[in-house]
Regions:
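Active-site gating/metal-coordination segments in enzymes
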Residues: 53-55
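Eukaryote-skewed repeat-based solenoidal scaffolds used as protein-protein interaction platforms
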Residues: 44-51, 62, 69-213
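C-terminal accessory extensions appended to soluble enzyme cores
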Residues: 1-32, 193-216
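Aromatic- and Gly/Pro-rich donor/ligand-binding loops
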Residues: 18-46, 60-63
């Protein structure tokens, strides 16, 4: 199958030939050193934002709200270049997904993020994991000593899910040694590192609705 055919089938292999890591050929992201705090808005809200140079864009939202960035990468790269920074897209890796789908979503997160970096976008790596067996590949392609982003949303509802989150978090600290962690959601007291906390998107959305109501 030709690259043109792969492009038509939506695999985006034509975006570039990037350095890769691990047995699954995950594109490698370059480290980013983010010293100043950035106000982050979710991708679907960013589409309507006029003051784009004041914000960063995150993807801690449902996949269907940002799949368009995968299906039309050049168009949305031009759009995202207008913001201060962008997080790598958080394609879902749910535990009930087949392992092949989990790895594919990790790969396309990096394929798109590496492309964004190649066109001059400041990309903060979003770190995610599934179960303990995902540790063998879920950190592939992530830079060492970089600012990174994580989200604890949905991981603190049971002892088991909280324990798994902490195990993955500690594995992240050990493997990629992030210099700063942009953290969305509740921060468990056990989490170490240089953490910059941000409220999850649903809390900021609630505040936005309340503010809009007051203005009426």
């Amino acid at each position: 199958m030709s690259l043109e055919a792969l492009k038509r089938n939506g695999h985006n292999l034509e975006l570039g030939e990037f350095e890769v890591a691990g047995q699954y050929g995950i594109p490698v992201l370059q480290p980013v050193h983010l010293n100043d705090r950035i106000d982050w808005i979710r991708f679907n809200h960013a589409l309507k934002e006029e003051n784009r140079d004041k914000y960063g864009v995150h993807f801690f939202i449902d996949d269907y709200l940002f799949e368009r960035a995968w299906h039309d990468p050049s168009r949305y790269a031009l759009f995202l270049r207008q913001f201060k920074a962008v997080m790598s897209p958080d394609f879902s890796m749910y535990s009930d997904f087949p392992k092949s789908v989990q790895i594919y979503n990790h790969w396309r997160k990096h394929q798109l993020a590496a492309f964004w970096q190649s066109v001059g976008i400041t990309v903060i790596p979003t770190i995610g994991w599934v179960g303990h067996d995902s540790f063998e590949w879920c950190f592939d392609g992530e830079p060492i000593h970089s600012t990174v982003a994580v989200s604890s949303v949905g991981t603190q509802k049971s002892k088991e899910s909280k324990a798994l989150f902490l195990d993955g978090y500690n594995e992240m600290l050990k493997r990629i040694k992030p210099e700063k962690i942009v953290f969305f959601g509740d921060v468990p007291k056990e989490c170490e590192g240089n953490i910059e906390h941000h409220a999850p998107y649903y809390e900021t959305f609630t505040r936005e609705l309340a503010f809009s109501a007051l203005r009426r």
